[in-house]
UniProtKB/Swiss-Prot annotation:
The keyword Transmembrane helix does not apply. InterPro entries: Glyco_hydro_1, Glyco_hydro_1_N_CS, Glycoside_hydrolase_SF. PROSITE patterns: GLYCOSYL_HYDROL_F1_2 (PS00653). This is Avenacosidase 1. The lineage of its organism: Eukaryota, Viridiplantae, Streptophyta, Embryophyta, Tracheophyta.
Length: 574
Protein backbone atom coordinates (compact mmCIF):
# COMPACT_ATOMS: atom_id res chain seq x y z
CA UNK A 1 0.00 0.00 0.00
CA UNK A 2 1.67 0.45 -0.67
CA UNK A 3 -0.21 1.50 2.70
CA UNK A 4 -0.49 2.74 3.02
CA UNK A 5 -1.10 2.14 3.30
CA UNK A 6 -0.10 1.59 0.85
CA UNK A 7 1.15 3.08 3.70
CA UNK A 8 -1.86 4.23 5.18
CA UNK A 9 -1.69 1.09 7.15
CA UNK A 10 -2.61 2.10 10.67
CA UNK A 11 -5.28 4.20 12.32
CA UNK A 12 -2.56 6.31 13.89
CA UNK A 13 -1.19 7.37 10.52
CA UNK A 14 0.95 10.46 11.14
CA UNK A 15 -1.39 12.81 9.32
CA UNK A 16 -4.28 11.63 11.46
CA UNK A 17 -3.04 12.07 15.03
CA UNK A 18 -3.29 15.57 16.44
CA UNK A 19 -4.18 17.37 19.65
CA UNK A 20 -7.87 17.42 20.52
CA UNK A 21 -7.97 18.39 24.15
CA UNK A 22 -11.14 17.09 25.74
CA UNK A 23 -12.81 16.16 22.46
CA UNK A 24 -13.09 12.40 22.99
CA UNK A 25 -15.07 11.93 19.80
CA UNK A 26 -12.14 12.71 17.51
CA UNK A 27 -11.63 9.85 15.08
CA UNK A 28 -7.90 9.53 15.28
CA UNK A 29 -7.05 10.24 18.92
CA UNK A 30 -6.75 6.54 19.69
CA UNK A 31 -4.83 4.35 22.05
CA UNK A 32 -2.02 2.43 20.36
CA UNK A 33 -3.57 -0.75 21.79
CA UNK A 34 -5.16 -2.64 18.85
CA UNK A 35 -8.09 -3.79 20.95
CA UNK A 36 -8.94 -0.21 21.81
CA UNK A 37 -8.62 0.84 18.18
CA UNK A 38 -11.12 -1.72 17.06
CA UNK A 39 -13.56 -0.67 19.79
CA UNK A 40 -13.34 3.06 19.24
CA UNK A 41 -12.47 3.48 15.59
CA UNK A 42 -14.78 5.83 13.70
CA UNK A 43 -17.04 6.13 16.77
CA UNK A 44 -19.15 3.31 15.36
CA UNK A 45 -20.26 0.12 16.99
CA UNK A 46 -19.33 -2.98 15.05
CA UNK A 47 -22.95 -3.60 14.15
CA UNK A 48 -23.53 -0.07 12.83
CA UNK A 49 -20.35 -0.22 10.77
CA UNK A 50 -21.38 -3.55 9.29
CA UNK A 51 -24.73 -1.99 8.39
CA UNK A 52 -23.00 0.89 6.60
CA UNK A 53 -20.82 -1.49 4.61
CA UNK A 54 -23.85 -3.60 3.70
CA UNK A 55 -25.55 -0.44 2.47
CA UNK A 56 -22.50 0.42 0.38
CA UNK A 57 -22.58 -3.08 -1.08
CA UNK A 58 -26.17 -2.57 -2.16
CA UNK A 59 -25.23 0.77 -3.72
CA UNK A 60 -22.37 -0.85 -5.62
CA UNK A 61 -24.86 -3.13 -7.34
CA UNK A 62 -26.73 -0.12 -8.71
CA UNK A 63 -23.98 1.52 -10.81
CA UNK A 64 -25.54 2.61 -14.08
CA UNK A 65 -23.95 1.45 -17.36
CA UNK A 66 -23.26 5.02 -18.48
CA UNK A 67 -21.32 5.63 -15.26
CA UNK A 68 -18.82 2.86 -16.00
CA UNK A 69 -15.56 4.28 -17.39
CA UNK A 70 -14.28 3.17 -20.77
CA UNK A 71 -10.68 2.82 -21.84
CA UNK A 72 -11.26 5.07 -24.86
CA UNK A 73 -12.14 7.94 -22.51
CA UNK A 74 -8.40 8.37 -21.98
CA UNK A 75 -5.59 9.39 -24.33
CA UNK A 76 -3.89 6.47 -26.11
CA UNK A 77 -0.63 7.14 -24.26
CA UNK A 78 -2.33 7.06 -20.82
CA UNK A 79 -0.98 4.01 -18.94
CA UNK A 80 -3.05 1.59 -16.89
CA UNK A 81 -1.19 -0.75 -14.61
CA UNK A 82 -0.96 -2.31 -11.17
CA UNK A 83 1.53 -1.86 -8.36
CA UNK A 84 3.30 -3.79 -5.61
CA UNK A 85 6.25 -3.45 -3.21
CA UNK A 86 9.18 -5.80 -2.62
CA UNK A 87 8.80 -6.42 1.10
CA UNK A 88 5.06 -6.95 0.79
CA UNK A 89 5.19 -9.64 -1.91
CA UNK A 90 8.64 -11.17 -2.47
CA UNK A 91 9.20 -13.37 0.56
CA UNK A 92 12.55 -15.23 0.48
CA UNK A 93 13.64 -12.86 3.22
CA UNK A 94 16.98 -14.60 3.83
CA UNK A 95 17.45 -16.38 0.50
CA UNK A 96 19.29 -15.57 -2.69
CA UNK A 97 21.97 -13.58 -0.87
CA UNK A 98 19.57 -10.99 0.55
CA UNK A 99 20.45 -9.18 3.76
CA UNK A 100 17.90 -8.37 6.50
CA UNK A 101 15.81 -5.23 6.21
CA UNK A 102 14.41 -2.95 8.89
CA UNK A 103 11.03 -4.60 8.37
CA UNK A 104 12.48 -8.10 8.78
CA UNK A 105 13.93 -6.98 12.08
CA UNK A 106 10.76 -5.17 13.13
CA UNK A 107 8.47 -8.16 12.50
CA UNK A 108 10.84 -10.73 13.98
CA UNK A 109 11.68 -8.69 17.08
CA UNK A 110 8.17 -7.39 17.81
CA UNK A 111 5.57 -9.77 16.32
CA UNK A 112 3.02 -8.40 18.79
CA UNK A 113 3.06 -5.11 16.87
CA UNK A 114 1.62 -6.76 13.76
CA UNK A 115 -2.13 -7.25 14.07
CA UNK A 116 -2.10 -10.96 13.26
CA UNK A 117 1.48 -11.44 14.54
CA UNK A 118 2.60 -12.39 11.04
CA UNK A 119 5.59 -11.38 8.93
CA UNK A 120 6.61 -11.24 5.28
CA UNK A 121 9.13 -14.08 5.35
CA UNK A 122 7.07 -15.74 2.60
CA UNK A 123 4.51 -13.01 1.81
CA UNK A 124 3.07 -13.80 -1.66
CA UNK A 125 6.21 -15.77 -2.58
CA UNK A 126 6.81 -13.56 -5.61
CA UNK A 127 10.56 -14.16 -5.50
CA UNK A 128 9.77 -17.64 -6.79
CA UNK A 129 6.41 -16.94 -8.45
CA UNK A 130 7.07 -13.68 -10.30
CA UNK A 131 6.16 -15.34 -13.59
CA UNK A 132 2.65 -15.91 -12.27
CA UNK A 133 2.47 -12.21 -11.38
CA UNK A 134 3.44 -11.32 -14.94
CA UNK A 135 0.90 -13.81 -16.24
CA UNK A 136 -1.81 -12.06 -14.21
CA UNK A 137 -0.76 -8.64 -15.50
CA UNK A 138 -0.86 -9.92 -19.05
CA UNK A 139 -4.19 -11.65 -18.67
CA UNK A 140 -5.77 -8.54 -17.14
CA UNK A 141 -4.36 -6.49 -20.01
CA UNK A 142 -2.23 -4.08 -18.00
CA UNK A 143 0.17 -1.77 -19.86
CA UNK A 144 2.58 -1.38 -16.99
CA UNK A 145 3.76 -2.66 -13.63
CA UNK A 146 5.11 -0.53 -10.79
CA UNK A 147 7.20 -2.54 -8.35
CA UNK A 148 10.03 -1.80 -5.93
CA UNK A 149 13.54 -3.14 -5.61
CA UNK A 150 14.69 -4.40 -2.24
CA UNK A 151 17.79 -2.43 -1.25
CA UNK A 152 19.16 -5.27 0.96
CA UNK A 153 18.62 -7.75 -1.88
CA UNK A 154 21.01 -5.67 -4.00
CA UNK A 155 23.40 -4.51 -1.26
CA UNK A 156 22.96 -6.94 1.67
CA UNK A 157 24.98 -4.72 4.01
CA UNK A 158 23.55 -1.52 2.60
CA UNK A 159 26.83 -0.20 1.19
CA UNK A 160 28.99 -0.71 -1.87
CA UNK A 161 31.86 -1.71 0.40
CA UNK A 162 29.69 -4.54 1.69
CA UNK A 163 29.43 -6.00 -1.78
CA UNK A 164 26.83 -6.37 -4.53
CA UNK A 165 24.57 -9.42 -4.44
CA UNK A 166 24.54 -10.69 -8.01
CA UNK A 167 21.76 -13.16 -7.28
CA UNK A 168 19.58 -10.17 -6.50
CA UNK A 169 20.66 -8.46 -9.71
CA UNK A 170 19.77 -11.63 -11.63
CA UNK A 171 16.34 -11.87 -10.00
CA UNK A 172 15.30 -8.37 -11.04
CA UNK A 173 16.77 -8.79 -14.51
CA UNK A 174 14.72 -11.96 -14.92
CA UNK A 175 11.58 -10.13 -13.79
CA UNK A 176 12.29 -7.22 -16.12
CA UNK A 177 12.93 -9.52 -19.06
CA UNK A 178 9.65 -11.31 -18.41
CA UNK A 179 7.71 -8.04 -18.26
CA UNK A 180 9.27 -6.60 -21.39
CA UNK A 181 8.82 -9.81 -23.39
CA UNK A 182 5.13 -9.63 -22.55
CA UNK A 183 4.74 -5.99 -23.54
CA UNK A 184 4.45 -4.67 -19.98
CA UNK A 185 6.32 -1.45 -19.21
CA UNK A 186 8.27 -1.48 -15.90
CA UNK A 187 8.17 1.42 -13.44
CA UNK A 188 10.62 0.96 -10.59
CA UNK A 189 10.45 2.37 -7.07
CA UNK A 190 13.95 2.35 -5.60
CA UNK A 191 12.85 2.56 -1.97
CA UNK A 192 9.57 1.33 -0.50
CA UNK A 193 10.45 1.40 3.21
CA UNK A 194 12.75 -1.66 3.49
CA UNK A 195 15.99 -0.06 4.71
CA UNK A 196 18.98 -2.43 5.10
CA UNK A 197 19.12 -3.36 8.78
CA UNK A 198 22.91 -3.08 8.63
CA UNK A 199 22.60 0.69 8.20
CA UNK A 200 20.21 0.96 11.13
CA UNK A 201 22.72 -0.93 13.26
CA UNK A 202 25.67 1.13 12.07
CA UNK A 203 24.34 4.69 12.23
CA UNK A 204 20.52 4.71 12.66
CA UNK A 205 19.91 4.87 8.90
CA UNK A 206 17.94 7.97 7.81
CA UNK A 207 18.68 9.85 11.03
CA UNK A 208 22.27 10.23 9.83
CA UNK A 209 23.60 12.17 6.81
CA UNK A 210 25.64 9.12 5.79
CA UNK A 211 22.44 7.67 4.37
CA UNK A 212 22.67 10.15 1.47
CA UNK A 213 25.83 8.60 0.02
CA UNK A 214 24.78 5.01 0.72
CA UNK A 215 21.38 5.49 -0.88
CA UNK A 216 22.88 7.23 -3.90
CA UNK A 217 25.39 4.39 -4.30
CA UNK A 218 22.56 1.85 -4.15
CA UNK A 219 20.51 3.76 -6.72
CA UNK A 220 23.54 4.01 -8.99
CA UNK A 221 23.97 0.22 -8.90
CA UNK A 222 20.34 -0.10 -10.01
CA UNK A 223 20.77 2.43 -12.82
CA UNK A 224 23.90 0.61 -13.95
CA UNK A 225 22.36 -2.87 -14.01
CA UNK A 226 18.75 -2.15 -15.00
CA UNK A 227 18.88 1.18 -16.82
CA UNK A 228 18.86 -0.37 -20.28
CA UNK A 229 15.48 -1.95 -19.50
CA UNK A 230 13.91 0.67 -17.21
CA UNK A 231 13.18 4.25 -18.28
CA UNK A 232 10.86 5.32 -15.44
CA UNK A 233 12.12 5.54 -11.86
CA UNK A 234 10.75 6.71 -8.51
CA UNK A 235 13.30 7.44 -5.79
CA UNK A 236 11.09 7.13 -2.69
CA UNK A 237 7.59 5.96 -1.86
CA UNK A 238 5.40 7.97 0.52
CA UNK A 239 8.06 9.80 2.55
CA UNK A 240 5.33 11.48 4.61
CA UNK A 241 4.15 8.11 5.94
CA UNK A 242 7.66 6.68 6.18
CA UNK A 243 8.87 9.56 8.37
CA UNK A 244 5.82 9.79 10.59
CA UNK A 245 5.07 6.12 11.20
CA UNK A 246 8.67 4.96 11.38
CA UNK A 247 10.22 7.80 13.38
CA UNK A 248 7.30 9.67 14.97
CA UNK A 249 4.77 7.18 16.27
CA UNK A 250 7.13 4.23 15.87
CA UNK A 251 4.28 2.02 14.67
CA UNK A 252 6.25 1.07 11.55
CA UNK A 253 9.85 0.02 11.13
CA UNK A 254 12.40 0.84 12.39
CA UNK A 255 10.04 1.20 15.33
CA UNK A 256 12.53 0.16 18.00
CA UNK A 257 11.46 3.15 20.02
CA UNK A 258 8.13 1.53 20.88
CA UNK A 259 7.79 -1.12 23.55
CA UNK A 260 6.01 -4.45 23.35
CA UNK A 261 2.24 -4.22 23.35
CA UNK A 262 2.23 -1.23 20.98
CA UNK A 263 2.87 1.20 23.83
CA UNK A 264 4.80 4.05 22.29
CA UNK A 265 7.68 5.29 24.42
CA UNK A 266 9.37 7.61 21.94
CA UNK A 267 10.64 10.60 23.89
CA UNK A 268 8.66 13.68 22.98
CA UNK A 269 11.76 15.47 21.74
CA UNK A 270 12.50 12.63 19.30
CA UNK A 271 8.89 12.36 18.13
CA UNK A 272 8.86 16.09 17.45
CA UNK A 273 12.25 16.33 15.77
CA UNK A 274 13.24 13.00 14.18
CA UNK A 275 10.59 12.83 11.43
CA UNK A 276 11.87 16.16 10.09
CA UNK A 277 15.51 15.01 10.21
CA UNK A 278 14.61 11.82 8.36
CA UNK A 279 12.57 13.74 5.80
CA UNK A 280 15.41 16.20 5.26
CA UNK A 281 18.00 13.48 4.68
CA UNK A 282 15.58 11.68 2.40
CA UNK A 283 15.18 14.81 0.26
CA UNK A 284 18.95 15.22 0.08
CA UNK A 285 19.32 11.59 -1.00
CA UNK A 286 16.64 12.13 -3.63
CA UNK A 287 18.39 15.23 -4.99
CA UNK A 288 21.81 13.55 -5.16
CA UNK A 289 20.35 10.48 -6.85
CA UNK A 290 18.49 12.52 -9.45
CA UNK A 291 21.65 14.52 -10.11
CA UNK A 292 23.62 11.31 -10.77
CA UNK A 293 20.83 9.93 -12.95
CA UNK A 294 20.55 13.07 -15.04
CA UNK A 295 24.31 13.32 -15.58
CA UNK A 296 25.13 9.71 -16.37
CA UNK A 297 22.08 7.52 -17.01
CA UNK A 298 19.10 9.53 -18.22
CA UNK A 299 19.78 9.49 -21.94
CA UNK A 300 17.06 10.70 -24.27
CA UNK A 301 14.13 8.83 -22.77
CA UNK A 302 14.83 8.29 -19.06
CA UNK A 303 12.63 9.93 -16.41
CA UNK A 304 12.68 10.06 -12.63
CA UNK A 305 10.51 11.40 -9.80
CA UNK A 306 9.13 10.68 -6.33
CA UNK A 307 5.89 9.13 -5.04
CA UNK A 308 3.87 11.11 -2.47
CA UNK A 309 0.87 9.99 -0.46
CA UNK A 310 -1.84 12.63 -0.72
CA UNK A 311 -5.22 13.62 0.65
CA UNK A 312 -7.52 16.31 -0.69
CA UNK A 313 -8.44 17.99 2.56
CA UNK A 314 -11.71 19.92 2.62
CA UNK A 315 -12.63 22.59 5.21
CA UNK A 316 -14.53 21.15 8.18
CA UNK A 317 -16.83 24.16 8.21
CA UNK A 318 -17.56 27.07 5.92
CA UNK A 319 -15.34 29.53 7.75
CA UNK A 320 -11.94 31.16 7.41
CA UNK A 321 -10.21 29.22 10.19
CA UNK A 322 -11.07 25.83 8.75
CA UNK A 323 -10.05 27.02 5.29
CA UNK A 324 -6.68 27.93 6.74
CA UNK A 325 -6.54 24.53 8.46
CA UNK A 326 -7.10 22.96 5.04
CA UNK A 327 -4.13 24.87 3.60
CA UNK A 328 -1.88 23.86 6.49
CA UNK A 329 -2.92 20.22 6.19
CA UNK A 330 -1.97 20.21 2.50
CA UNK A 331 1.32 21.96 3.28
CA UNK A 332 2.31 19.41 5.93
CA UNK A 333 1.09 16.41 3.94
CA UNK A 334 2.14 17.23 0.37
CA UNK A 335 4.16 20.43 0.49
CA UNK A 336 6.62 18.97 3.02
CA UNK A 337 8.29 17.09 0.17
CA UNK A 338 6.99 18.72 -2.99
CA UNK A 339 7.73 22.38 -2.24
CA UNK A 340 11.48 21.79 -1.74
CA UNK A 341 11.51 20.19 -5.21
CA UNK A 342 9.52 23.09 -6.69
CA UNK A 343 11.03 26.15 -4.98
CA UNK A 344 13.90 24.88 -2.82
CA UNK A 345 12.43 25.17 0.69
CA UNK A 346 9.70 23.89 2.96
CA UNK A 347 6.27 25.57 3.05
CA UNK A 348 6.09 28.83 4.96
CA UNK A 349 3.53 27.34 7.36
CA UNK A 350 5.98 24.59 8.29
CA UNK A 351 8.81 27.06 8.82
CA UNK A 352 6.53 29.12 11.07
CA UNK A 353 5.07 26.30 13.16
CA UNK A 354 7.95 23.81 13.38
CA UNK A 355 10.63 26.40 14.02
CA UNK A 356 14.21 25.27 14.57
CA UNK A 357 13.21 21.61 14.52
CA UNK A 358 12.96 21.91 10.74
CA UNK A 359 16.43 21.74 9.12
CA UNK A 360 17.68 24.20 6.52
CA UNK A 361 19.04 23.57 3.03
CA UNK A 362 22.28 25.08 1.81
CA UNK A 363 22.27 27.02 -1.45
CA UNK A 364 23.91 24.13 -3.34
CA UNK A 365 21.37 21.68 -1.89
CA UNK A 366 18.54 23.93 -3.00
CA UNK A 367 19.97 24.11 -6.51
CA UNK A 368 19.96 20.31 -6.76
CA UNK A 369 16.49 19.99 -5.26
CA UNK A 370 14.68 22.46 -7.49
CA UNK A 371 13.21 20.69 -10.53
CA UNK A 372 14.62 17.34 -9.35
CA UNK A 373 11.76 15.46 -10.99
CA UNK A 374 10.38 14.71 -14.42
CA UNK A 375 7.06 13.60 -12.93
CA UNK A 376 5.40 13.10 -9.56
CA UNK A 377 3.60 9.98 -8.41
CA UNK A 378 0.64 10.37 -6.08
CA UNK A 379 -0.93 7.64 -3.97
CA UNK A 380 -4.57 8.51 -3.33
CA UNK A 381 -6.98 6.45 -1.23
CA UNK A 382 -9.22 8.80 0.72
CA UNK A 383 -9.60 12.31 2.16
CA UNK A 384 -10.62 14.12 5.34
CA UNK A 385 -12.11 17.38 6.54
CA UNK A 386 -9.58 19.75 8.10
CA UNK A 387 -10.71 21.27 11.41
CA UNK A 388 -8.84 24.22 12.87
CA UNK A 389 -7.10 23.90 16.24
CA UNK A 390 -6.39 27.12 18.07
CA UNK A 391 -2.71 28.02 18.15
CA UNK A 392 -2.13 28.96 21.76
CA UNK A 393 0.55 28.73 24.47
CA UNK A 394 -1.63 26.20 26.32
CA UNK A 395 -1.20 23.63 23.55
CA UNK A 396 2.18 21.89 23.58
CA UNK A 397 2.83 19.52 20.64
CA UNK A 398 3.69 15.96 21.62
CA UNK A 399 4.50 14.54 18.19
CA UNK A 400 5.30 15.95 14.76
CA UNK A 401 1.73 15.61 13.50
CA UNK A 402 0.55 18.03 16.18
CA UNK A 403 2.48 20.80 14.45
CA UNK A 404 -0.14 21.31 11.74
CA UNK A 405 -2.84 22.57 14.17
CA UNK A 406 -5.48 20.88 12.05
CA UNK A 407 -7.61 17.88 12.98
CA UNK A 408 -8.50 15.40 10.21
CA UNK A 409 -12.19 14.51 10.53
CA UNK A 410 -14.36 11.96 8.72
CA UNK A 411 -17.52 14.07 9.19
CA UNK A 412 -17.93 17.77 8.47
CA UNK A 413 -19.45 20.32 10.87
CA UNK A 414 -22.93 19.12 9.90
CA UNK A 415 -22.11 15.49 10.63
CA UNK A 416 -21.96 14.49 6.95
CA UNK A 417 -19.19 11.97 6.17
CA UNK A 418 -16.74 12.74 3.41
CA UNK A 419 -17.76 9.56 1.62
CA UNK A 420 -19.11 6.04 2.06
CA UNK A 421 -17.26 3.39 4.05
CA UNK A 422 -15.88 0.92 1.50
CA UNK A 423 -14.62 -1.90 3.70
CA UNK A 424 -11.19 -0.71 4.82
CA UNK A 425 -11.47 1.05 8.15
CA UNK A 426 -9.78 4.31 7.18
CA UNK A 427 -10.91 4.50 3.53
CA UNK A 428 -14.02 6.54 2.82
CA UNK A 429 -14.52 6.74 -0.93
CA UNK A 430 -14.19 10.34 -2.12
CA UNK A 431 -13.36 10.37 -5.85
CA UNK A 432 -14.03 14.10 -6.03
CA UNK A 433 -11.00 14.50 -3.78
CA UNK A 434 -8.76 12.91 -6.38
CA UNK A 435 -10.02 15.33 -9.01
CA UNK A 436 -9.62 18.25 -6.60
CA UNK A 437 -6.06 17.41 -5.62
CA UNK A 438 -5.04 16.92 -9.24
CA UNK A 439 -6.36 20.39 -10.04
CA UNK A 440 -4.87 21.87 -6.86
CA UNK A 441 -1.41 20.50 -7.71
CA UNK A 442 -1.65 22.17 -11.10
CA UNK A 443 -2.30 25.54 -9.46
CA UNK A 444 -0.08 25.26 -6.38
CA UNK A 445 2.93 23.26 -7.55
CA UNK A 446 3.55 24.26 -11.15
CA UNK A 447 1.53 21.64 -13.02
CA UNK A 448 3.94 18.68 -12.73
CA UNK A 449 3.31 15.60 -14.89
CA UNK A 450 1.55 13.09 -12.63
CA UNK A 451 1.02 9.37 -12.37
CA UNK A 452 -1.60 8.07 -9.94
CA UNK A 453 0.80 5.46 -8.62
CA UNK A 454 -1.55 3.87 -6.08
CA UNK A 455 -5.34 3.87 -5.91
CA UNK A 456 -7.60 1.19 -4.50
CA UNK A 457 -9.34 -0.19 -1.46
CA UNK A 458 -9.12 -3.30 0.68
CA UNK A 459 -11.11 -6.19 2.00
CA UNK A 460 -10.78 -6.58 5.76
CA UNK A 461 -11.14 -9.62 8.00
CA UNK A 462 -12.88 -8.67 11.24
CA UNK A 463 -12.78 -5.13 12.67
CA UNK A 464 -16.53 -4.72 12.27
CA UNK A 465 -16.76 -5.96 8.70
CA UNK A 466 -19.41 -8.45 7.64
CA UNK A 467 -18.04 -12.01 7.40
CA UNK A 468 -16.33 -12.52 4.06
CA UNK A 469 -17.98 -15.50 2.40
CA UNK A 470 -16.33 -15.13 -1.02
CA UNK A 471 -12.89 -13.44 -1.21
CA UNK A 472 -13.23 -13.21 -5.01
CA UNK A 473 -16.43 -11.16 -4.89
CA UNK A 474 -15.40 -7.51 -4.42
CA UNK A 475 -18.11 -5.14 -5.72
CA UNK A 476 -16.97 -2.26 -3.51
CA UNK A 477 -13.53 -2.35 -5.10
CA UNK A 478 -15.03 -2.35 -8.60
CA UNK A 479 -17.22 0.65 -7.81
CA UNK A 480 -14.33 2.43 -6.09
CA UNK A 481 -12.06 2.02 -9.12
CA UNK A 482 -14.78 3.01 -11.57
CA UNK A 483 -15.60 6.20 -9.69
CA UNK A 484 -11.96 7.23 -9.31
CA UNK A 485 -11.20 6.58 -12.98
CA UNK A 486 -14.17 8.78 -13.82
CA UNK A 487 -12.73 11.50 -11.56
CA UNK A 488 -9.43 11.30 -13.45
CA UNK A 489 -11.27 11.76 -16.73
CA UNK A 490 -13.06 14.80 -15.30
CA UNK A 491 -9.73 16.30 -14.23
CA UNK A 492 -8.34 15.79 -17.73
CA UNK A 493 -11.41 17.48 -19.21
CA UNK A 494 -10.87 20.43 -16.85
CA UNK A 495 -7.38 21.01 -18.20
CA UNK A 496 -5.21 18.59 -16.19
CA UNK A 497 -3.64 17.22 -19.36
CA UNK A 498 -0.30 16.19 -17.88
CA UNK A 499 -1.78 13.07 -16.25
CA UNK A 500 0.09 10.03 -17.48
CA UNK A 501 -1.35 6.93 -15.90
CA UNK A 502 -3.17 5.02 -13.16
CA UNK A 503 -1.81 2.10 -11.15
CA UNK A 504 -4.26 0.01 -9.15
CA UNK A 505 -3.05 -0.90 -5.68
CA UNK A 506 -2.45 -3.68 -5.61
CA UNK A 507 -1.87 -6.42 -8.13
CA UNK A 508 -2.02 -9.19 -5.53
CA UNK A 509 -2.99 -9.57 -1.89
CA UNK A 510 0.10 -8.94 0.20
CA UNK A 511 1.55 -8.31 3.63
CA UNK A 512 -0.06 -5.01 4.58
CA UNK A 513 2.51 -3.69 7.05
CA UNK A 514 1.15 -3.45 10.62
CA UNK A 515 -2.12 -5.10 9.55
CA UNK A 516 -0.34 -8.24 8.40
CA UNK A 517 -2.61 -10.35 6.22
CA UNK A 518 -5.88 -9.04 7.69
CA UNK A 519 -6.13 -6.45 4.92
CA UNK A 520 -6.28 -7.49 1.26
CA UNK A 521 -5.82 -4.80 -1.39
CA UNK A 522 -5.21 -7.14 -4.31
CA UNK A 523 -7.29 -7.48 -7.45
CA UNK A 524 -5.81 -10.99 -7.46
CA UNK A 525 -6.45 -13.25 -4.47
CA UNK A 526 -3.54 -15.12 -2.89
CA UNK A 527 -4.58 -18.48 -1.48
CA UNK A 528 -2.05 -18.90 1.29
CA UNK A 529 -3.44 -22.36 2.03
CA UNK A 530 -2.68 -23.55 -1.49
CA UNK A 531 0.89 -22.56 -2.23
CA UNK A 532 0.11 -18.85 -2.75
CA UNK A 533 -2.01 -19.69 -5.77
CA UNK A 534 -3.12 -16.61 -7.75
CA UNK A 535 -6.86 -16.30 -8.50
CA UNK A 536 -8.44 -13.27 -10.17
CA UNK A 537 -11.12 -11.45 -8.20
CA UNK A 538 -14.13 -9.95 -9.95
CA UNK A 539 -12.36 -6.58 -9.94
CA UNK A 540 -9.53 -8.07 -12.01
CA UNK A 541 -12.08 -9.50 -14.42
CA UNK A 542 -13.72 -6.09 -14.75
CA UNK A 543 -10.31 -4.49 -15.41
CA UNK A 544 -9.66 -7.21 -17.98
CA UNK A 545 -12.83 -6.14 -19.77
CA UNK A 546 -11.94 -2.45 -19.36
CA UNK A 547 -8.51 -3.05 -20.91
CA UNK A 548 -9.94 -5.04 -23.80
CA UNK A 549 -7.84 -8.01 -22.75
CA UNK A 550 -10.48 -10.59 -23.72
CA UNK A 551 -9.97 -9.69 -27.37
CA UNK A 552 -6.21 -9.91 -26.95
CA UNK A 553 -6.49 -13.33 -25.35
CA UNK A 554 -8.64 -14.55 -28.21
CA UNK A 555 -5.78 -13.50 -30.49
CA UNK A 556 -3.43 -15.68 -28.40
CA UNK A 557 -1.22 -12.88 -27.17
CA UNK A 558 -1.11 -14.31 -23.64
CA UNK A 559 1.63 -16.83 -23.16
CA UNK A 560 3.48 -15.85 -26.32
CA UNK A 561 6.62 -15.32 -24.27
CA UNK A 562 8.62 -18.24 -23.00
CA UNK A 563 9.24 -16.42 -19.73
CA UNK A 564 5.79 -17.37 -18.49
CA UNK A 565 6.30 -21.08 -19.09
CA UNK A 566 6.97 -21.73 -15.40
CA UNK A 567 6.50 -20.23 -11.98
CA UNK A 568 9.81 -20.69 -10.22
CA UNK A 569 12.87 -18.50 -9.95
CA UNK A 570 16.33 -19.90 -10.13
CA UNK A 571 18.84 -18.11 -12.27
CA UNK A 572 16.18 -17.39 -14.85
CA UNK A 573 15.08 -20.99 -15.47
CA UNK A 574 11.60 -22.33 -14.98
Amino acid sequence: MALLCSALSNSTHPSFRSHIGANSENLWHLSADPAQKSKRRCNLTLSSRAARISSALESAKQVKPWQVPKRDWFPPEFMFGAASAAYQIEGAWNEGGKGPSSWDNFCHSHPDRIMDKSNADVAANSYYMYKEDVRMLKEIGMDSYRFSISWPRILPKGTLDGGINHEGIQYYNDLLDCLIENGIKPYITLFHWDTPQALADEYKDFLDRRIVKDYTDYATVCFEHFGDKVKNWFTFNEPHSFCGLGYGTGLHAPGARCSAGMTCVIPEEDALRNPYIVGHNLLLAHAETVDVYNKFYKGDDGQIGMVLDVMAYEPYGNNFLDQQAQERAIDFHIGWFLEPMVRGDYPFSMRSLVGDRLPFFTKSEQEKLVSSYDFVGINYYTSRFAKHIDISPEFIPKINTDDVYSNPEVNDSNGIPIGPDVGMYFIYSYPKGLKNILLRMKEKYGNPPIYITENGTADMDGWGNPPMTDPLDDPLRIEYLQQHMTAIKEAIDLGRRTLRGHFTWSLIDNFEWSLGYLSRFGIVYIDRNDGCKRIMKKSAKWLKEFNGATKKLNNKILGASSCCSGVTHGGGTA
